[in-house]
Amino acid sequence: MRAGLPEPPGGARPLLIFPCNGNALEALDCLGSAFRLIGFVDDSPEKLGRTLHGHEVFPRAALADWPDALVLAVPGSPTSFRVRSGLIDGLALDPARFARVVHPSARVSPLASLGRNVLVMAGVVITSNAVIGDHVCILPNTVIHHDVRIGDWTLIGSNATLAGRVTVGPGCYLGSGCSVMNGLTIGAGALIGIGSTVIRPVSPGATVAGNPARPLG
């Protein structure tokens, strides 16, 4: 684990989750006893003031109202993942405020490295020498093998398998159920379709899908 990341010192740390979306709902299951959720932060007027599972949805001012709270920022979907870096940077937070949330059932090797603002969901396996960048979200039951490198801002769906020495560039989206052959490189900003089998390198910004995966469009 990277030095300087906040850990709960003998008690649960207060936490805000941005935005109030599907990833945030998934994160609720991952908090365990390490965090105490204050609520959600969102920019959508129709969500503000509502409660979700007993937690209120606040405007961005909440980030300043609770200056000691850690923040988990998990925007992004298959249609919006390429703008998530701007959304997170737009929060203008001290990097030390970003949380790292790992579901208690996930298995992360002590020889792996996780960045800031990383969400690792239930059943994920991350093995030796894997390096997960900042602002990465990994959905349930994905397996990331030895020496894999995941770039900042990347989202990985559920039940994906990344074989050894795969390199995923920043700002990618890997759809649920995809498999990536060992040693391949996925270029920055690429989209891998659901259930795809990737047996060739993927160019930056490309969208590929199928078995084997081929460029679309």
For each of these PLM feature ranges, what is it?
Residues P45-R107:
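Phosphate-bearing ligand-interacting subdomains
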Residues G22-N23, T79-R82, T197:
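Short alpha-helical
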Residues I38, A69-L70, R116:
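Conserved acidic residues
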Residues P19, P75, N182:
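Small/polar loops that bind or transfer phosphate-bearing groups
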Residues V101-A209, A213-L216:
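Structural signal for interior beta-strand "rungs" in well-ordered beta-sheet cores
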Residues M1-A61, W66:
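Hydrophobic, well-ordered beta-alpha structural blocks that scaffold small-molecule cofactor pockets
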Residues E26-L28, R82-R84, V202:
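Short glycine-/acidic-enriched loop or helix-start segments at secondary-structure transitions
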